[in-house]
Amino acid sequence: PDSHYIEIVENFKALKSVWNAEGKEVKGKELNEREISSVIQMLGRYDVLFEATTIDMGLQSDDAIGRHKEAQAQNITENLTSAHHPSLVEESTQLQFKLRQLSNQLYIQFVLGVALLGKALQDATLYYVQRRPAELGCFRWVIDAKDKTTTGYEVLWLNMIRPILMSQSFEQPLNMLKGADYSSFQKFQGVLPKVPEFLMGVVNERTPYEYTDITKLLRDLEFRNSEEEPGIQLVDILCN
């Protein structure tokens, strides 16, 4: 939670000092069980929510992954017609091509990353509205960067994460707790008199049409190097 982030970082620095790692990047694989436990205990004093998505690669095959990737690529242009602006058609076609070019390993990472962000968004809103509703007024997404400069994969992920989650939200809107205080979250919600024409047939007809603005929710999203981001280091430790 933002309200405790600075305090959490300071406590993490104190732990690193005990480990003789002050000012250094700490990797989870470098810590022993006792040191990892101390991180978990420290985070346990705050309303920290930990999410993970996993896959058993032993149950997957290259053919199955390839078919899944191709199906996702086809979905990008499935609903495009001559009525759409040529620039949108061109952009969508380029995204489709780049997705198909991903290796199966990167594609799996792509899918898990999308699933994780969507799951974190749903669970975090329900979790914090019951504990710290003011936290729902700001969302900052920081992702571990692969290199010092943004990679082609990361650019593709950034270009696709918003439309993918937006499409998912049409069919599965965020679950919201009845009677809870969502006043801080109102800035991310919108209301239209009816379902927009471009969504006719995609979502169920309802008046008024209430929706969550995924673009606003993901506005503050960036890839950062783990060396300069304590939060990413903490996630790496928890994942080990």
Predicted regions and their residues:
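Phosphate-ester processing/binding pockets and catalytic centers
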Residues: 2-240
